[in-house]
Design a protein with these regions (language model features):
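Conserved interdomain linker/interface between the two RecA-like ATPase lobes of SF2 helicase motors
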Residues: 26, 51-121
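Residues immediately C-terminal
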Residues: 2-8, 36, 120, 184, ...
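Conserved two-lobed SF2 helicase motor
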Residues: 167-183
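Post-DEXD/H (motif II) to motif III coupling segment of the RecA-like Helicase ATP-binding lobe
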Residues: 3-75
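C-terminal helicase lobe and adjacent C-terminal extensions/tails of nucleic-acid helicase motors
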Residues: 40, 99-169, 190, 194-256
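Loop/turn-to-beta-strand initiation segments
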Residues: 24-29, 110, 171-175
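Ser/Thr-glycine-rich phosphate-binding loops at phosphate-binding pockets of nucleotides
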Residues: 31-35, 177-181, 195
Length: 256
C-alpha cells in the first residue's frame, strides 16, 4: 500500500512539474527501462500541456526515443542489443535459500539476493555468514551511514562491474545481499539472482542485474536464472510496502 500511494502522488507531481517545464519550454530528458506506453503518453501529454494523445504503436521495436517540440511528436527506433537472454524463473522456499545458493555455487559464481526489507536482508546475511559457504559476502541497504554505503557500493562495483573496466576484480565466488538499492543505478552483473516478489516493473529492474555483461560464466550458471522467494507466512512484510493487490496481481502475471 505504501508503494502504491507513493507512486500515485509521485506521478501526479511529475506530471505537474512537466507541465510547468513545458510551459517555459525547458528541455527535459526522461530515461526508463520499464516505461509502459500509457505512462509515456501521460508524461508527453503533460509536457505538451495536455495535447492530443499519442497514437499507440505496440508493434514498434524497443529501445526507442520519443521526442516532442510541443508542435509534433516523433519516435526513433534503435536496433536491439545482440545479447538476447531468456531468463528462467523458478520459486525457492525461504527456508531453502542457503542450500540453493550453496548448490548453485558448486563451481563458483557471483550471486545477488534482493530482499524487500532491511531486517530480512540482515537476517539472511547472518544466516549465510554462519553457513559453510565459502565466498566473499557483502551486505548493502539504505540504513547504512552515507559514507559506509558509498564505500560498500564502491566495493560491489569493483567486484561485479564491467569486464572492460580495469578496476573490476571479479572474484571466483561472492554473494551480495541487499535491498532495493541493488535494483537502482548500480551497473553490476550477477551469475544468479534470488529475489523477493515485487511489482513487475521493479522485478525487471532486478533481473537487469542478471547476466548483464558478456563474460564467461561458471559451469551450471551458463544461462540466466532468477529464483523468486516463496514465503509461507501470512503476514508478508512486502505487502506493507507494495500492497497486497499489486503483488498478487503481478505474481499472477509472472510465468514460471
Amino acid at each position: 500500500m505504501k508503494y502504491m500511494l507513493m507512486m500515485r502522488f509521485m506521478n501526479q507531481y511529475l506530471e505537474r512539474t512537466l507541465s510547468w517545464l513545458g510551459a517555459y519550454e525547458v528541455p527535459v530528458v526522461l530515461l526508463s527501462a520499464t516505461l509502459p506506453f500509457e505512462r509515456k503518453n501521460r508524461l508527453v501529454s503533460a509536457y505538451m500541456n495536455n495535447a492530443e494523445a499519442i497514437q499507440p504503436d505496440y508493434a514498434a521495436a524497443l529501445p526507442r526515443i520519443t521526442y516532442t517540440d510541443k508542435q509534433s511528436i516523433e519516435t526513433i527506433n534503435f536496433p536491439k542489443s545482440e545479447q538476447q537472454n531468456t531468463v528462467k524463473l523458478s520459486y525457492v522456499s525461504e527456508t531453502d535459500i542457503v542450500e540453493t545458493v550453496n548448490k548453485k555455487m558448486a563451481n563458483g559464481g557471483c550471486v545477488g539476493i534482493i530482499l524487500n526489507t532491511v531486517s530480512r536482508a540482515q537476517q539472511l546475511y547472518r544466516l549465510l555468514r554462519a553457513s559453510d559457504i565459502s565466498a566473499d559476502m557483502l551486505l548493502i541497504h539504505s540504513e547504512f551511514l552515507p559514507s559506509d554505503r558509498i564505500r560498500i557500493e564502491s566495493q560491489i562495483r569493483e567486484l561485479l562491474g564491467k569486464p572492460s573496466d580495469k578496476r573490476t576484480r571479479r572474484p571466483e565466488r561472492c554473494i551480495v545481499v541487499g535491498t532495493q538499492v541493488l535494483e537502482q543505478s548500480l551497473d553490476i552483473d550477477f551469475d544468479l539472482l534470488i529475489t523477493d516478489m515485487s511489482p513487475v516493473d521493479l522485478l525487471l529492474q532486478r533481473i537487469g542485474r542478471l547476466h548483464r555483461h558478456n563474460r564467461v560464466r561458471p559451469s551450471g550458471l551458463d544461462n540466466p536464472e532468477c529464483y523468486i522467494i516463496s514465503r509461507g507466512d501470512e503476514k508478508d512484510t512486502s505487502e506493507l510496502i507494495y500492497g497486497r493487490y499489486l503483488l498478487k496481481a503481478d505474481k499472477g502475471s509472472v510465468e514460471l
